[in-house]
Amino acid sequence: MLSKIVGSVIGTKNDRELKRMRQIVAKVNAQEAAISALTDAQLRDKTAEFKSRFDEGASLDSLLPEAFAVCREASKRVLGMRHYDVQIIGGITLHEGKIAEMRTGEGKTLMATLAIYLNAISGKGVHVVTVNDYLAARDAELNRPLFDFLGLTVGVIYSQQPPYEKVAAYQSDITYGTNNEYGFDYLRDNMVFSLAEKKQRPLNYCIIDEIDSILIDEARTPLIISGQADDSSATYALINNIIPRLTRSTDEEANKENEDGDFWIDEKNRQIEISEKGYEKIESFLIEVGELGENESLYSPIRLPLLAHVQAAIRAHHIFIKNVHYIVDNGEVIIVDENTGRTMPGRRWSDGLHQAVEAKEGVEIQAENQTLATTTFQNYFRLYDKLSGMTGTADTEAAEFKSTYDIDVVVIPTHKPIARIDLEDQIFLTKLGKYKGIIREIKEIQAKGAPVLVGTATIEASEELSYLLDQEGIKHNVLNAKQHEREAEIIAQAGSPKAVTIATNMAGRGTDIILGGNWQAHISDPDNVSPEEMQRLKAAWQKKHDEVLAAGGLHIIGSERHESRRIDNQLRGRAGRQGDPGQSRFFLSLEDDLMRIFAGDRVVNMMRAMGLKEDEAIEHKMVSRSIENAQGKVESRDFDARKNLLKYDDIANEQRKVIYSQRDDLLAEADLKQAIEAMHRDVYDALISQFVPPGSIDDQWNIDGLEDELESEFKYYMPINDWLDSDRRLDEEGLREKIVQTAIARYRERRELMTPENAAQLERHFMLQSLDRHWKEHLTQMDQLRKGIHLRGYAQKDPQQEYKRESFELFQMMLGAIKSDTVQDLSRVHIPTREELEAMEAERLAQAERQQMMFEHDEVDSLTGERHSDPDVEARNLAAEQQATATKAPAAANGNNPYANMNISRNAPCPCGSGLRYKQCHGKI
């Protein structure tokens, strides 16, 4: 209350920002007369002039008024659209690295061209991020004529894109693509073996469309590149047979004390817990089928993976619901995004959940994957020098944007006042009663001649409503994940008079519903339409448009409240675009998940005490407040979860930055001799300490063991006993130094047998191979540590501090292992000729190309890892199969083995980088 009073007196922060920006808008408008007098050639030459001024030291801020005026004039000439003043405010917001909240239909795509143009002048590249490939391609093609006119290049990145095309797209002044593709390209760039293979330039400036969807809804979404791990499909099928034998607790709260069931479910967090009785029953079954020994327990460390299978199976059967969280199509389990209602083909939950659902549905169980590289959207997008975004709904999450990304939200005023009427919610006792109320409302809206869009949270709800409308004889269209092929056609006509469209949350974010329908959709051949036909279609559309306006515009019906107010606002925002009339209302029931789980008993008891009939509704502020409080609780819980995840991921992110920085240094460094010699000192020193402890006397030394270990590890015998016999003064420190110097001298001798270029190439190859192999294993260890770290809380320890400490220890061990493997490989390997090195590199590139093709192909069938309790948060995962799959037919099989003369141990990793042992790859007989 106090903040409202103060705001009314001195104005809000948003008001002050708008006031400041309007002064800049005035400067842009002051340039309009002079800029509009320029010829096309003179207008085009302005870009080169701006670039020259920038190179000479002018800031982008100083260029803004004139550059925006140039972009607006070019848009007017090329696209036939002139930026409104509010769109210029939006452009300023984006340029300043803020989020522009702009209502649906206000022209976000056109607004963004201003900030894109200005920031492209720097020559460092601008990345425009969209939520799917269609929108990236659409926006690029819409704006390409404008940017071509202004002398800027435009590129689009997409999955399965040939490498040379992707490089060209990233070298363009402006690059369009999806958040997934940018993130995966970043990870792929940090898996290459030469700088020439990298695709991305340094990350400069980024504009994210629908930024709330990407940085809030998908913030907990890890981007994962993975390869196939061991197949355990038989175990999933076996565990699936246990679940029908288990009994769910009838009283979830009492169960923890009385154990009246085998497991209970935490619906709020979508997790399960198994009772002691349940553990005993599961163990008995596993012993019965031979999966568990007589004296073994599920609690034993070696059996924890089996326990994870059981937990995943229970979640699959009792938490994840068909046609709500996933659908089954052509024998495949496909995830449904609960935020958008879209299916996500190829994405898979991780931690065995997807395989458990496949076992439950009786379809083919696909193999699990192993993580090769990973990051999160939170950490990836924070790598940009400047980050901005736009959406229709961001203000409710302004605090999170500020605390996590240090970005402010500016609410951009609409060009015309909003004419949409948002009616009070109607609450019913039962879901069926709610559906009856919705159908009654649809009939009333149709009688007026207005179109209606019914938003549902799940596919199941959309199909239930569709069935009831069929029973009433009401013609309608259904837009959900099962009909996504018809999305464009359905959305195009959703604004026609009396049209009824049922849609899940996927209902075309990024696509406007035009009142009267889209007349252009009726043109079958755009290249051959006559002017008369076009005029006829426009006239017919105008008649329908006027009819819908007279009927009150598009009417929105929400079939239930989403857990997030932002998603509800997105649905409301489908109506009332650009000052059009419209109406919205939500219909709720006590059986809705949000009401059932979060609404207080007081609300439920009050409604039941009123004696309402099934299809009677109430509108009450207390109920509305209760719903808003419930949504606030969920949003707060989700914010805390994202914030908590970020704390953990920040620890992993620091390690990731160190590894990727080392990789870049390796790729860029021409001479690695000093680095390799330093590695020799570290590795030999550590090994010596195992047999000659620091500060020890000679009676404590194990010289025979040291000689054997050095010969075994490095294929080089050092006569240490002879040294000691011939020099009685050789103490522990002197002996240590003599061994290290001997090892370095041998390295130098072997290196002299090669040219400096050949030596650097071989050293770089082994160092990168070792680094990548151990980083992959480290990611798996970090993942396992993260899953169990919460248990430290029971020992009165801070899980986050424990994770930080242990992950650092693991990281130190990994760095030591990288050095050790590199020194071992270089000590053992046969000195290759130039021809052998060229053959080795050619084979690596050929394999990389094979892997890239499989990698890109599998991106369509990508793997989504469900890493959190909330099922609408899935981890992005490309099932790259980079390791075993790409080398199923190694070159050795046809006699082409570039490593044949290199004296490589058959159990050593293959030098080609496949991840297989040499005997299983190029050393295959």
Swiss-Prot record:
Transmembrane segments: none annotated. Part of the Sec protein translocase complex. Interacts with the SecYEG preprotein conducting channel. Has a central role in coupling the hydrolysis of ATP to the transfer of proteins into and across the cell membrane, serving both as a receptor for the preprotein-SecB complex and as an ATP-driven molecular motor driving the stepwise translocation of polypeptide chains across the membrane. Its main location: membrane. ATP binds at residues 87, 105-109, 512. It comes from the Bacteria. It is a peripheral membrane protein. The lineage of its organism: Bacteria, Pseudomonadati, Pseudomonadota, Gammaproteobacteria, Moraxellales. This is Protein translocase subunit SecA. Belongs to the SecA family. Its EC number is 7.4.2.8. One of its GO terms (cellular component) is cytosol. The keyword Lipoprotein does not apply. It is found in: Cell inner membrane; Cytoplasm. It catalyses: ATP + H2O + cellular proteinSide 1 = ADP + phosphate + cellular proteinSide 2. Monomer and homodimer. Part of the essential Sec protein translocation apparatus which comprises SecA, SecYEG and auxiliary proteins SecDF-YajC and YidC. It comes from Psychrobacter sp. (strain PRwf-1). One of its GO terms (biological process) is protein transport by the Sec complex. CDD domains: DEXDc_SecA (cd17928), SF2_C_secA (cd18803). Its cofactor is Zn(2+). It is an enzyme of class 7 (translocase). Keywords: ATP-binding, Cell inner membrane, Cell membrane, Cytoplasm, Membrane, Metal-binding, Nucleotide-binding, Protein transport, Translocase, Translocation, Transport, Zinc. Zn(2+) binds at residues 910, 912, 921-922. May bind 1 zinc ion per subunit.
